[in-house]
Amino acid sequence: MPKKVCLISFLVACSLWSMPRAAQAQALIPHVLQLNTAQLEKQGLSLAQEAAQLVQFQQFELALPRARLATQLAPNNDKVWLLLGSLHLQNKDYKAAIAALNQSQTLNPQNPDVLFALGSANFQQKNYQAALLNYQAGLKLKPNDPEGLFDLGNAYLVLDKFPEAIAQFNQAIAQNKKFWPAINNIGLIKYEQGDIPGAIQKWQEAVAIDNKAAEPLLALAVALYVKGDKQKGLEMRDSALRIDQRYADLDFLKQNLWGTRLLSDTEKFLQVKR
């Protein structure tokens, strides 16, 4: 399971509420230009806050033009560029996202959220090595961030560096005991390694934390069926798909980092009729 991109926008939106008022222009600038510059920046920050509010209500299409205009009116505010970049990332416009995020990083190189967002942009484009470097850089600035640790684990996972991935997932869990996506992804690795009992244990832990999480429930169903507990597996499968029908789509499962062995077993399992 990869992290959902919209979380980045939401976190940025929350941070924008605390943005300071626009600073006054330098004293040497003519008075009229002072007022105009300050007023434009103030309008830009106001637009950014409107965009942030729209993001909280998932109204991304309305937020984007406001964020874009905000960067023109307040071009020296790194949070405004981060908001614009995260909105482009939400829309899968990766080129525009990276351009905006790079501008944000230029203005504030010490913001780990920018590096995490750049990692997500590279990860979505399958530039996994670049994503890994972004996540590592972000974690140097914010070492105990569970989402950042999880993302780095996913980068290691897709690069088939399983021990490193498990280490990052375990660190994420250490920061947040209820962070079931990291527990789930350890299960994905164990299944690919042929450790079905170990995978079952992890998916059971994930389901115990959130019994409405369709992904670990379906994965657990597959593993139980393969192990021989066919009736229970089929019951769990039906429950998982009632929660989220998308998990019946193998392409969707692949996007959620399910490996070759698990995908093969799931394909057969989904064809079984009760």
Model segments located where?
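Structural signature of tandem alpha-helical TPR/SEL1-like repeats
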Residues: 57-66, 90-103, 124-137, 158-171, ...
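Alpha-helical segment of the N-proximal tetratricopeptide repeat
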Residues: 40-79, 83-93, 120-124, 154
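Terminal, low-structured helical/coil segments at or just beyond the last alpha-helical repeat
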Residues: 26-40, 232-274
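Structural marker of alpha-solenoid helical repeat scaffolds
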Residues: 73, 107, 141, 175-176, ...
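Long, contiguous interaction/recruitment modules in multidomain scaffold/adaptor proteins
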Residues: 1-42, 56-57, 62-69, 273-274
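TPR/TPR-like (Sel1-like) alpha-helical repeat modules
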Residues: 204, 208, 214, 218-249
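Helix-start (N-cap) detector for alpha-helical repeat units in TPR-like alpha-solenoids
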Residues: 44, 78-79, 112-113, 146-147, ...
